Amino acid sequence: MKKIMFWITLIVGITVVFGSCSSSEDTTTTSSTSLPGYAATTLSGKIGTDWTFKTGRMVVPSSSSGSYSYDMTNDNLSNACSSSYTGTSSNPSVYFSRDAAPEAGEHELSFTSGNVKTVAFYDGTTIYIIAKGKITIDTVTTTAVTGKMYAISGSDTDHEINGTFTLSRCCIDNSTYSLCSE
């Protein structure tokens, strides 16, 4: 009987010790880099020259295996869906694509094995692959995608943009892209 009491006491004692040593901590995911907050103004900054977002689109792929492409320019294009987005030194463009449909949330840009989320700045001669920054999608509707972006080429403030955007959501219709209606 003494042996049974000894083992019960030992087990209860160990349980109490380990129970009192455990801790419950709230953990949050934070960025390993320190990025500034989003500007509350229209997406703007510099891409070699002063740049302010004016026209943009998010193209829905025509097949389930395609990717969603995002195009932005500081040029006033008459039709965001059917216009050509060609970057020039005076009208640079911003491009990126994702395999998944856009949904609300923030994504940090990165260029690591298994996690490539970049943005490209194109100034008519050079494509700058941007892996420092973040993009937040706020809303996705049938016809539009709204969000915020901060992106910088390393520490080069001559290639840095920050602010809000609204993109037309474009779908293919009779071999041409037009505003989605689905």
Question: Which role does the model predict for each range below?
Answer:
Residues 136-145, 156, 169:
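A short, structured loop/turn motif at beta-sheet edges
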Residues 57-139:
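Surface-exposed helix/loop patches within compact recognition domains
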Residues 41, 66-68, 143-145, 159-161:
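Residues at beta-strand starts and edge strands
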Residues 1-20:
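Sec-dependent bacterial lipoprotein signal peptides
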Residues 21, 141-151:
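A short hydrophobic beta-strand element
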Residues 31-54, 60:
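Polar/acidic, low-complexity leader/linker segments enriched in S/T/G and N/D
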